[in-house]
């Protein structure tokens, strides 16, 4: 297995680069972000993943090992080939992909050209548990984190007129639509997200204690 290439950059194109290794030119496909870090005539290093097919062997290059790891995990999804996996990395950085996979955020993947809702749903389904954000706490710790911020958000909402029951239910429903907000655990952001969710439907705003007849 070729883990990385280091040598003089001989060429940088729109989708590939050529690394000169003691007179042998190795061509690698890479994202625009990775290619932008390579400069002709200078030493360059890319982490690589070798894809072997019946009639070809193709190298894909990455800025770091994390990017390569995400690429290879994406390849485990049925229907996702190396070009599509690379396209995902061209649109989103590895951590954003980890967060989207961890929170079940289909919309992140539909932003990638060539990925529709059906494929995005399959990616999220098949990546469940395979990609997690760096520093993600175990489930028990996540529950403990929620226990620390939720009472604060509920208290803020009750001060605005909602009952504790309605406030708690609204928070849960709002964050079900935007799970990445819950993951960050920022109280003001969670409050804004919940109030925005309530404001999207006039009927929801009627849940305030003071507005009941």
From Swiss-Prot:
Gene3D superfamilies: 5' to 3' exonuclease, C-terminal subdomain, DNA helicase RuvA subunit, C-terminal domain, Nucleic acid-binding proteins
CDD domains: UBA_RuvA_C (cd14332)
GO molecular function, one term: four-way junction helicase activity
Keyword Magnesium: no
Source species of the chain: Pseudarthrobacter chlorophenolicus (strain ATCC 700700 / DSM 12829 / CIP 107037 / JCM 12360 / KCTC 9906 / NCIMB 13794 / A6)
Keyword annotations: Cytoplasm, DNA damage, DNA recombination, DNA repair, DNA-binding
InterPro entries assigned to the protein according to its UniProt record, in alphabetical order: DNA_helicase_Holl-junc_RuvA_I, Hlx-hairpin-Hlx_DNA-bd_motif, NA-bd_OB-fold, RuvA, RuvA_2-like, RuvA_C, RuvA_C_sf
Record text about domains: Has three domains with a flexible linker between the domains II and III and assumes an 'L' shape. Domain III is highly mobile and contacts RuvB.
GO biological process: DNA recombination; DNA repair
Protein name as it appears in the record: Holliday junction branch migration complex subunit RuvA
UniProt-annotated stretches for the region Flexible linker: 140-144
Role: The RuvA-RuvB-RuvC complex processes Holliday junction (HJ) DNA during genetic recombination and DNA repair, while the RuvA-RuvB complex plays an important role in the rescue of blocked DNA replication forks via replication fork reversal (RFR). RuvA specifically binds to HJ cruciform DNA, conferring on it an open structure. The RuvB hexamer acts as an ATP-dependent pump, pulling dsDNA into and through the RuvAB complex. HJ branch migration allows RuvC to scan DNA until it finds its consensus sequence, where it cleaves and resolves the cruciform DNA.
Subcellular locations according to the entry: Cytoplasm
Alphabetical list of Pfam families matching this protein: HHH_5, RuvA_C, RuvA_N
Ranges where the record places region Domain I: 1-63
């Amino acid at each position: 297995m070729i883990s990385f290439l280091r040598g003089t950059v001989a060429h940088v194109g729109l989708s590939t680069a050529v690394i000169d290794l003691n007179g042998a030119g190795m061509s690698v496909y890479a994202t625009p972000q990775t290619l932008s870090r390579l400069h002709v005539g200078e030493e360059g290093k890319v982490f690589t993943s070798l894809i072997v097919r019946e009639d070809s062997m193709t190298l894909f290059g990455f800025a770091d090992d994390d990017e390569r790891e995400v690429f290879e995990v994406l390849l485990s999804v049925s229907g996702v080939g190396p070009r599509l996996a690379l396209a995902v990395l061209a649109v989103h950085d590895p951590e954003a992909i980890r967060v989207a996979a961890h929170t079940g955020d289909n919309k992140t993947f539909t932003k990638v050209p060539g990925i529709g809702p059906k494929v995005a749903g399959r990616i999220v389904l098949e990546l469940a548990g395979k990609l997690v954000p760096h520093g993600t706490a175990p489930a028990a710790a996540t529950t403990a984190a929620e226990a620390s911020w939720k009472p604060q958000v509920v208290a803020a909402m009750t001060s605005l007129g909602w009952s504790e029951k309605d406030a708690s239910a609204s928070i849960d429903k709002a964050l079900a639509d935007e799970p990445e907000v819950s993951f960050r655990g920022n109280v003001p952001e969670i409050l804004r997200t919940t109030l925005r969710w309530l404001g999207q439907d006039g009927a929801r705003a009627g849940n305030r204690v003071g507005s009941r007849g």
